[in-house]
């Protein structure tokens, strides 16, 4: 309740009309990062509608407390923790399209997302493959590793990269005890044989991606 009141203070004395205008201004700032020229207004509408939907997720799952510190409710421990957290995203196939876009056009946002991934690992022992808000058993493979690697190779550094490296290595050699799509199902076969035998698992190609 106290945090809800704290969040309400961010509105100040603005009325609904002013808040709506602030929202429009913010979206224009975000979408205006890319300028497109086309004589066909429908092409412009399509592009910016798609860009708008692209940057809706991952959803920010953090806020600032009364001391001005960034905090989040951890879906993994059920407690309030310091730092960033993001949710409502699956990395298949956003690792090859959305996250490279974030690295190019919104790098400061993806630095926060990377910090949130590090917090997910520290609080749960694994990187997420599909967060909603915690680990969800509906995604296979280690696409989170691609998200982490692409951010680092794109030059992003404003987060704990060493912790994320540990998370990537761990996720390639372990399976979550309750959500077997998190981690690398079949890693024992792959590490020993270099492949996963056909009859050992369903979706045999995806777990070792």
Region locations from a protein language model:
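Residue-level detector of conserved catalytic or cofactor/ligand-binding positions
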Residues: 200-208
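Glycine-rich phosphate-binding loop of nucleotide-binding enzymes
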Residues: 66-75, 95-103, 109-118
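A conserved hydrophobic secondary-structure block that centers on an alpha-helix together
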Residues: 37, 87-88, 107-111, 116-125
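Second-shell loop/turn segments in exported
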Residues: 12, 34-38, 85-87, 99-103, ...
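Active-site-proximal structural scaffolding
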Residues: 20, 43-44, 90-94, 106, ...
């Amino acid at each position: 309740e106290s945090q809800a009141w704290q969040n309400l203070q961010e509105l100040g004395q603005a009325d609904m009309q002013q808040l709506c205008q602030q929202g429009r201004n913010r979206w224009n700032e975000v979408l205006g990062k890319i300028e497109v020229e086309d004589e066909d207004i429908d092409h412009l509408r399509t592009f910016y509608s798609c860009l708008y939907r692209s940057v809706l997720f991952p959803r920010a799952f953090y806020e600032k407390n009364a001391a001005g510190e960034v905090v989040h409710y951890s879906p993994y421990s059920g407690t309030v923790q310091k730092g960033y957290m993001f949710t409502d995203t699956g990395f298949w196939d956003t690792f090859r399209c959305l996250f490279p876009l974030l690295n190019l056009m919104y790098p400061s946002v993806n630095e926060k997302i990377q910090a949130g991934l590090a917090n997910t690992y520290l609080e749960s022992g694994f990187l997420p493959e599909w967060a909603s808000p915690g680990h969800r058993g509906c995604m296979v493979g280690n696409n989170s590793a691609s998200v982490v690697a692409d951010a680092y190779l794109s030059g992003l550094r404003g987060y704990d990269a060493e912790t994320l490296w540990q998370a990537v290595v761990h996720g390639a050699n372990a399976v979550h005890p309750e959500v077997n799509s998190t981690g690398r199902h079949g890693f024992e076969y792959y590490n020993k044989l270099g492949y996963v035998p056909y009859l050992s698992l369903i979706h045999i190609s995806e777990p070792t991606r």
